[in-house]
């Protein structure tokens, strides 16, 4: 199952995949860490095995190190964005939030663990456009889309490594996959859960 943990303020939504492993997608900001922990406790979650970041932006990743410290679990991110997460550089857009990104200690490039993730039921789709290392995740006939597409809009493409053509192509790819596999639930990086109507809304923006 996928447990939605609402984002607060400018923090991203977080999602917990509960299956063979407890996998936390996008822990959000360090400023909302305590709220996230309260939600996990309220849902009876005592262990996190892995963190996956859909991309390296501060509002999705700055609580990585706190989750790592508490649960002793590594963070996974697409290979191209490992260096940005480690360095907390301009690609993480931490300066937009007036803060510094403290990276987790153990970061695993996606390519090194992708086959293992398949054994847990996760299929990774590379969806560049919002950033060049953005990913989406298929799990149990649902799509976790990060900031590629929202229920009623699309992610920005004007930030470092963003590209509107890549974003359009990625959204078209996700739409094709959703139609072919009859996936009708989208879990975006911000806002409410969507369905395949999200792809129609996306066309209004790109």
Swiss-Prot record:
Its EC number is 3.-.-.-. Pfam families: Lactamase_B. Its cofactor is Zn(2+). Zn(2+) 2 binds at residues 59-60, 147, 190. GO terms for molecular function: hydrolase activity; metal ion binding. Keywords: Hydrolase, Metal-binding, Zinc. It is an enzyme of class 3 (hydrolase). Zn(2+) 1 binds at residues 55, 57, 130, 147. This is Probable metallo-hydrolase MJ0888. It comes from Methanocaldococcus jannaschii (strain ATCC 43067 / DSM 2661 / JAL-1 / JCM 10045 / NBRC 100440).
């Amino acid at each position: 199952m996928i447990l939605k943990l609402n984002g607060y303020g400018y923090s991203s939504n977080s999602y917990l995949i509960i299956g063979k492993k407890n996998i936390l997608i996008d822990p959000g900001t360090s400023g909302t860490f305590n709220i996230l922990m309260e939600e996990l406790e309220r849902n009876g979650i005592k262990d996190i095995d892995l963190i996956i970041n859909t991309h390296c932006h501060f509002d999705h990743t700055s609580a990585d190190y706190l989750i790592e410290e508490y649960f002793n679990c590594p963070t996974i991110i697409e290979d191209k964005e490992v260096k940005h997460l480690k360095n907390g550089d301009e690609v993480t857009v931490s300066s937009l939030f007036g803060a510094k990104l403290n990276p987790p200690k153990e970061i695993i490039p996606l390519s090194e663990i992708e086959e293992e993730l398949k054994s847990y039921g996760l299929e990774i789709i590379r969806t560049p456009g919002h950033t060049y290392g953005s990913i989406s995740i298929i799990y149990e006939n649902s799509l976790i889309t990060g900031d590629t597409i929202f229920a009623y809009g699309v992610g920005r493409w004007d930030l470092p490594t963003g590209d509107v053509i890549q974003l359009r192509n990625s959204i078209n790819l996700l739409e094709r996959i959703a139609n072919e596999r009859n996936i009708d639930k989208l879990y975006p990086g911000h806002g409410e859960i969507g369905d395949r109507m999200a792809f129609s809304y996306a066309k209004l923006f790109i």
